[in-house]
């Protein structure tokens, strides 16, 4: 007797959000939602970390985006970073701060997680964080030169004068905190995500 081929369905209870070749399961979407929520909540934790520039603050949302990138790839990490800050913008209207946060995180998370994805070792993670950190540092300095004069009364020459004493040290400390935070929590979280 010939067997009847099974039909593929798009029923809501199949717990899949893609076709056979896709990789976005319901579990992955739920995990993404949780990561975005945690990123959003932590974006409101503002810690002054550099006494010379009390207006520049560190928030742990970058750690969440970096963990997402390491766990699911650069696209997901970037998505978590961008969604976190777009939602933040709905509650605190600060387009300048949001733009700077997105540029900072995307330039860190994308290269770091792309390198780690191709070398899933501690060495790959460290190399990714170093390259991502350098990219983020460069982007933050350049973006400050362009964006800050557009949104504030600070001139380009005043921003340029802040590069060495304020912008580079602050962003280095911020990047190190994000990378160390990710390194400390990534393994336990990745085990929980794969369970």
Regions found by a protein language model. Name each.
Residues 1-195:
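Loop-helix junctions at membrane interfaces
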